[in-house]
Design a protein with these regions (language model features):
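Non-catalytic cap/lid and distal C-terminal segments of serine-dependent acyl enzymes
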Residues: 1-210
Length: 210
């Protein structure tokens, strides 16, 4: 939810960047309980259509309203399933976003949809559509000009994120897309405590990255 970052002190660890005028943070509410995490009430097609409505709202309504000037840089970021959303927005619309920072994410749609696949699910599964994207696709050139950072630990709860991050690492490398996949140690678990360490570390580097 949109308040998770404040409740878990992510805003607090980013305060030095915010107070220095280097960073503005916009947290967006999700509807994951109705879509990706909804195992009981809706069929898969209804869930992905609902998700797509939310996605289009962010792209078509929210983003234009928060953009203060055409030169403003936007980077998507998130941890855990927020990392999936960050990657999904960025890789679907690199024309709108300047980069991405994804912590401990899983980047394929099977997380919420199991074996079900249709065109809309595919469009929301970065690991799938990037694998099949032709190297001459115009987005590939855009990716090469963007800031792409993945990080995952290798401790408790990070196994699926580790496998998925390694797969994204492989796909991007095969397409000669510059990126940084940082693998932290086996003492780094799937938890806010570690994301509070990672977030300012990477944000500082991204803001200095030219």
């Amino acid at each position: 939810r949109f308040y998770d970052w404040e409740d878990n002190k992510m805003i607090e660890v980013l305060a030095p960047f915010i107070n220095a005028g280097r960073l503005r943070v916009i947290t967006i509410d999700s509807i994951d309980s109705e879509t990706w995490s909804n195992k009981d009430y809706w069929d898969n097609r209804t869930k992905i259509e609902r998700h797509e409505c939310w996605y289009q709202y962010i792209i078509e309504e929210l983003l234009p309203n928060v953009r203060q000037n055409p030169e403003q840089m936007f980077i998507t970021t998130g941890a855990s399933f927020g990392a999936f959303h960050a990657a999904n927005f960025f890789f679907r619309r690199p024309d709108l976003f300047n980069g991405m920072l994804a912590l401990s994410g899983i980047y394929y749609a099977a997380y919420g949809f199991g074996d079900y696949m249709d065109g809309l699910v595919y469009e929301n599964s970065p690991q799938n559509f990037l694998q099949n994207m032709p190297k001459e696709h115009p987005y590939v050139d855009m990716y090469r000009q963007r800031k792409i950072v993945f990080c995952t630990g290798q401790g408790i709860g990070e196994q699926e994120a580790l496998v998925s991050t390694r797969e994204m690492d492989r796909i991007l490398s095969e397409k000669a897309i510059p990126h940084w996949c940082d693998y932290w140690g086996s003492d780094i678990n799937h938890d806010w405590h570690f994301w509070r360490r990672q977030m300012p570390y990477f944000i500082d580097k991204i803001l200095m990255w030219r």
